[in-house]
């Protein structure tokens, strides 16, 4: 018998024990209508199952199915019920173990499928980068060959009395006003808290692509799609130089990094960079929430 049939027989024995004077037909009828059954069953089928189980248990005795029984027969019924209950519990335990093994197997298959999808996506991205690189390098190499084939034009020396024009140097940032001791302490406290936080984001398992500026050779169209590039290394330098001194300002700039990732790579859940950006974004929010909560408690 399967578990559902064993439960039906066990339910019959329970109802028989609770109603020792009820006729068998009523017991079979009440058992068939019980809400505790695992699946519907007809009275005739139930009767056959009860007789079959008693026969298999070497307890086949018509008196056990009737209500005219002695105390010894009642004890026999109780023993039968106990044995059947143990069988049901054993079968249920085995069924549960089987289900758990199936679930573990399914989880492993899902994890492998996800890993394979990420691996395939990375392979596609790498192939796409190689194709773009080859497409970009081909005309550049042709142009270089053309230039090398031309005759060099002699350089024209500048007159001795005219100094050559010096290319303008990079503008130096304006000197910041001298900070008071209180402002210096506040800035130092801000730096000691925020720089390690940015390091934690960089050290995240998916944080490497966001730790430095995007390589324009690998993404030549990046500036045409992203209005204001940003990266964690640049933010660390801005903090060290005192150009960012507020938590909210830093938070906005960090979010800009992941917004740029979405802008350039799209929101396709199968895109590896999109997945990495989402993971780092959630991790960043957790870090800033922890910092804000700690700051609130310390006030």
Curated annotation (Swiss-Prot):
Which SUPFAM superfamilies does the record cross-reference, listed alphabetically?
Bromodomain
The UniProt keywords, alphabetically, are: Activator, Bromodomain, Chromatin regulator, DNA damage, Nucleus, Transcription, Transcription regulation
Region Disordered, annotated ranges: 54-79, 130-152
Q: Which Pfam families match?
A: Bromodomain
Q: Does the keyword DNA damage apply?
A: yes
Q: Where in the cell is it found?
A: Nucleus
Q: Which residues form the Bromo domain?
A: 182-298
Q: Which domain of life is it from?
A: Eukaryota
Which GO cellular component term is one of those annotated? Answer: NuA4 histone acetyltransferase complex
User: How does this protein assemble?
Assistant: Component of the NuA4 histone acetyltransferase complex.
Q: What is this protein called?
A: Bromodomain-containing protein 1
């Amino acid at each position: 018998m399967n578990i559902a049939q064993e439960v039906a027989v066990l339910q019959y024995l329970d109802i028989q024990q609770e109603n020792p004077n009820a006729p068998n037909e009523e017991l079979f009828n009440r058992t068939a209508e019980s809400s505790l059954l695992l699946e519907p069953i007809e009275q005739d089928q139930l009767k056959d199952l009860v007789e079959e189980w008693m026969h298999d248990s070497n307890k086949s005795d018509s008196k056990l199915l009737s209500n005219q029984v002695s105390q010894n027969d009642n004890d026999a019924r109780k023993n039968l019920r106990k044995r059947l209950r143990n069988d049901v519990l054993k079968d249920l335990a085995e069924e549960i173990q089987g289900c758990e093994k199936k679930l573990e197997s399914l989880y492993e298959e899902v994890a492998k499928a996800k890993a394979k999808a990420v691996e395939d996506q990375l392979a596609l991205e790498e192939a796409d980068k190689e194709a773009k690189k080859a497409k970009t390098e081909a005309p550049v190499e042709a142009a270089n060959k053309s230039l090398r084939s031309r005759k060099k034009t002699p350089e024209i020396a500048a007159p001795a009395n005219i100094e050559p024009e010096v290319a303008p140097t990079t503008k130096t940032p304006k000197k910041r006003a001298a900070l008071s001791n209180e402002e210096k302490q506040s800035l130092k406290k801000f730096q000691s808290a925020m720089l390690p936080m940015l390091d934690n984001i960089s050290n995240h398992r998916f944080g490497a692509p966001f730790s430095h500026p995007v390589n324009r050779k690998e993404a030549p169209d990046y500036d045409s799609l992203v209005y204001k590039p940003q990266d964690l290394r640049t933010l660390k330098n801005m903090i060290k130089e005192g150009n960012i001194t507020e938590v909210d300002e830093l938070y906005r700039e960090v979010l800009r990094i992941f917004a740029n990732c979405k802008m350039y790579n799209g929101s396709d859940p199968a895109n590896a960079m999109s997945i990495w950006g989402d993971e780092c974004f959630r991790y960043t929010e957790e870090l800033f929430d922890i910092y804000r909560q700690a700051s609130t408690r310390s006030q």
